[in-house]
């Protein structure tokens, strides 16, 4: 004789319980109403370093960092100019997501200051996950800006590309067109 045990979900749909029992789930029978399935107890520890790198890599092509609005002289202004100047907003947003810094930023200098206060250390050779700061370049009419992004390995980095207005993968030194000024590393990423 085969006993087939079925549960019933909240919408009244029946489902077999046997396979769940074989996988280690517990079943609580409720008279004539339904059965509750409880996941077996597991110890789950988030892998922050790998998740951080995955978020950086998965951010490629994302337009969520394109606009950052502020009131400038009482007027609503997109201070990132539709993604042209979004590098610090992008990098600080990702870092803040993992509590690697204290707050989000709109400038490279304020992001670097927060990184240093938050325990990031200067290193000579980039490690996967390190934050890279590139030298200032002239955007137009004497409008000089530094640049910031993430090192992902194999001489590759991800940063907000001004011409695109969103993060993209590129050569670490933009094919020797931009010098690295500073590399910062967080010991928590080991």
What are these regions (language model features)?
Residues 157-190:
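Active-site or metal-binding loop neighborhoods of secreted/extracellular toxin and effector enzymes
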Residues 23, 31-46, 188-190:
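N-terminal secretion targeting segments of exported proteins
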Residues 103-169:
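...with weaker cross-activation on analogous glycine-rich loops/strands in unrelated enzymes
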Residues 1, 19-27:
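Short Gly/Ser/Thr- and charged-rich N-terminal loops/segments
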Residues 6-9, 25:
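Acidic/polar hotspots within intrinsically disordered regions
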Residues 36-104:
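N-terminal capping segments
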């Amino acid at each position: 004789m085969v006993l087939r045990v079925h549960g019933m979900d909240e919408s009244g749909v029946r489902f077999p319980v046997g396979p769940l029992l074989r996988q280690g789930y517990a079943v609580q029978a409720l008279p004539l109403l339904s059965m509750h399935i409880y996941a077996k107890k597991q110890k789950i520890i988030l892998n922050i370093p790998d998740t951080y790198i995955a978020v950086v890599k998965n951010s490629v092509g994302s337009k969520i960092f394109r606009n950052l609005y502020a009131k400038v002289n009482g007027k609503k202004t997109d201070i990132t100019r539709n993604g042209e100047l979004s590098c610090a907003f992008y990098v600080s947003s990702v870092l803040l997501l993992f509590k690697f810094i204290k707050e989000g930023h709109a400038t490279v200098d304020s992001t670097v200051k927060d990184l240093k206060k938050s325990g990031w250390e200067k290193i000579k050779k980039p490690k996967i996950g390190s934050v890279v700061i590139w030298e200032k370049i002239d955007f137009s009419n004497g409008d000089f800006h530094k640049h910031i992004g993430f090192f992902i390995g194999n001489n590759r980095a991800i940063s907000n590309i001004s011409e695109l207005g969103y993060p993209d993968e590129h050569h670490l030194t933009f094919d020797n067109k931009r010098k690295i000024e500073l590399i910062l590393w967080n010991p928590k990423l080991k």
